[in-house]
Amino acid sequence: MVGIPGPYQFTGDKRVPAMPGSPMEVKIHSRSSPPIMAPLPPVNPGGLRPVGFPPSSHSNGINHSPPTLNGAPSPPQRSSNGPSSSSSSSLANQQLPATCGVRQLSKLKRFLTTLQQFGNDISPEIGEKVRTLVLALVNSTVTIEEFHCKLQEATNFPLRPFVIPFLKANLPLLQRELLHCARAGKQTPSQYLAQHEHILLNTSTSSPADSSELLMEMNGNGKRHSPDRREEERETAPAEPPVKRVCTISPAPRHSPALSLPLVNSTSHFHPTPPPLQHYSLEDIPSSQLYRDHLNKIGEHRDVRDRHHSSGVNGNLNNGYQEELVDHRLTEREWAEEWKHLDHALNCIMEMVEKTRRSMAVLRRCQEVDRDELNYWKRRFNESNEIRKGSEHPSRQHSPSSTDSGASDSVRDFGSRTGAGYVTDEIWRKAEEAVNEVKRQAMSEVQKAVSEAEQKAFEMIASERARMEQTIVDAKRRAAEDAVLVVNEQEESTESCWNCGRKASETCSGCNIARYCGSFCQHKDWEKHHRICGQSMHTQAKPLTPSRSLIPKASDPVLLSPTLERSSSATSRSSTPASVTAVDGL
C-alpha cells in the first residue's frame, strides 16, 4: 500500500481512524523517515485507498507530532503562537468520519461544561466569568493561551498540562460545526452561539467529567483545598509523576526491555510486543505531550478500556500495535501521603472522642451536684415547714396525742408524696418554692444586716467626730492655759529671761517688769509682751527729779504721765527699745 510500510498496512476490517492529535483511540505508527509527515488519511468504507498529502500542505508552520499511547491527545507544534482559529482553516478541507467528529465534540463539550460547573461551584460570579471565557474561546475572540491564563486568574486553579493540547486539537472541530450551523441558519457564529448556548453547555445529555481530572490539586498560592473538595479529589493520586515510570513515547535507544514481554488487556487476550519507535526523538515531542501525570494516565486508561469494549475487536490487531496498560500501583511517596492523611484523620477522631468523653464526665458531675443541692434544699424546706407548724400550733407540743397526730400527718403526707400518684412537676414546684423562700429569707437577713452595719458605721463616725472635736477644743484650751501659765511664770520670775529662761541682765523700758538676757530675746518676745507691757504699772509713782536716773528701779513706783506713755509706746514700736526720758510735769 502506498504511503504506509508493508508490515503496518491495515487489514480488511473496517476501523474508524482517529484524527491526528485527538485523545480518542489512537495507535502508534512507525515512520520510515523522521521529516514531516501528514496525518493518516481517512479510511474508505468501500475499501482501503492510499491517500497521501503533499509536503506543501505543511507550509503554514504546523508539524503534526506523533500520537501518544493510551489515547492521549497529540497537539500540533506551531512555529507561531496564533489564535486557535488558524487551525480551523487547515482542517476545513479534511473530511472526517461522523463518529470521530461526534466523539471529539462530545469530549470537548463535556470539558467546557465541566469548567463552567466548576466555576459555579466556587461562586456565581466566577461561574459567569468562566462562561464568558468559554463563549469567547469558541467564538475565537481569545486564544487558547489567553483562555488558559484568564481561567487561572478567575478560578485560581491551573489547568492540567494536557488541556491546552486537547483544546488545540479539538477546538477547530467545534468551531467548524458552529460555522456550519450558523451558515445553515443564515447567522454569524457569534449570533448562533448566543441563541443556542444551551447546546454547547448542556449538562443533561452526558455527565461532565470530574473537575479534579482537569485541575491541579493545589491552587495558585499553594494553599490546600477545603475538606469537602479534598474528599472528592483524594480518590486519585497526587499530581507529581512517579520517579520510576516507563515513558509512553521513547526513542529507540531508551526502549525498555520490560516492553518486550506480552501484556494482557482487559479481555485476557495476549498481544504481540510492539516494535520500538525508531524514528522519534524527544525534540519532536513537546513537553506538554509527555503526560507523566498519574491522574491523566488513569483517566486515559479508563477511556482506552471503554473504547476497547465498545469496539468489539477482542484482541484483533489491525496494525500490530497494542495500547500500553497503566500501572495502578501507588508509589512509596503516594502511600506515605495516604498514610499521613489517614493518621491525621484518626487523630482528629480520637481527639473528638476524648473531648466528648470529658464533656460527658463534666455533665455527669454537674448533675450530681445539682441533685445534691436539690436534696439539701428539700431538707431545709422540710425543716422550715416543721418549725412553722410547731410555731403555729404550740398547744400540740404539750399534749402527746397532738404530737402523735402531727407525726402521723407528716408520715401520711410523706407516704402520699412517695406514692405512685406523686407527680414530678409537683416536686419541682415545691422545690422551687422552697428555694425561693430560702432566698427571700436570706435576702431579708442580708438587708437587715446591711442596715444594722450602716447604722453602726454612722454612729461610730458621729462618735469619732464628736471625740475629735472635743479633743481639738481641749487642746486649744490647754494651749491657752499653757500660754497664760508661761506668762505668769515670766511675771513671777524677775531674774530669768522671759524668752529663753536664762539669767536676765536687762529690763523692759516700757513696763520695767519684763527681764531679758539681751536685745535679741526682747525682740523675739515683743509680739507677746507688747500686749501687757505697761498694764502692770503701779497706779502711784513718785515724781522724778532731774538728777534722778532715767531708768527707774523696780522697787520705786513711778507714775507715768501721758507724754511718757506716748514716748514709751513710740519707743516700743522702734527696732531697739530705748530709755524713757523724764518729762517735767510742767
UniProtKB/Swiss-Prot annotation:
Swiss-Prot/TrEMBL GO biological process terms: DNA-templated transcription; negative regulation of DNA-templated transcription; negative regulation of neurogenesis; negative regulation of neuron projection development
Function, as annotated, reads:
May act as a transcriptional corepressor.
Q: Spans of biased composition, class Low complexity?
A: 77-90, 399-409, 566-586
Q: What is its main location?
A: nucleus
Residue ranges under compositional bias (Basic and acidic residues)?
228-237
Gene designation per UniProt:
cbfa2t2
The cross-references to Pfam families, in alphabetical order and at most eight, read: NHR2, TAFH, zf-MYND
Instruction: Note down the stretches annotated as region Disordered.
Output: 1-95, 204-242, 387-417, 561-586
Residue spans of biased composition, Polar residues class: 56-68
Enumerate the residues binding Zn(2+) 2.
508, 511, 529, 533
Q: In its keyword annotation, does this UniProt entry include Zinc?
A: yes
Gene Ontology, cellular component aspect: nucleus
MF (Gene Ontology): transcription corepressor activity; zinc ion binding
Question: What is the organism field in this record?
Answer: Xenopus laevis
Q: Which UniProt keywords apply?
A: Coiled coil, Metal-binding, Nucleus, Repressor, Transcription, Transcription regulation, Zinc, Zinc-finger
The family database entries (InterPro entries) matched by this protein are listed as:
CBFA2T1/2/3 (IPR013289), MTGR1 (IPR013291), NHR2 (IPR014896), TAFH/NHR1_dom_sf (IPR037249), TAFH_NHR1 (IPR003894), Znf_MYND (IPR002893)
Record's subcellular location: Nucleus
Query: Which chain positions lie within coiled-coil regions?
Result: 429-481
Q: Where is the TAFH domain?
A: 102-197
Query: What name goes with this protein?
Result: Protein CBFA2T2
Residue ranges covered by zinc fingers (MYND-type): 497-533
Query: For binding Zn(2+) 1, which residues are annotated in this chain's numbering?
Result: 497, 500, 517, 521
- Is Nucleus among the key words of this record? yes
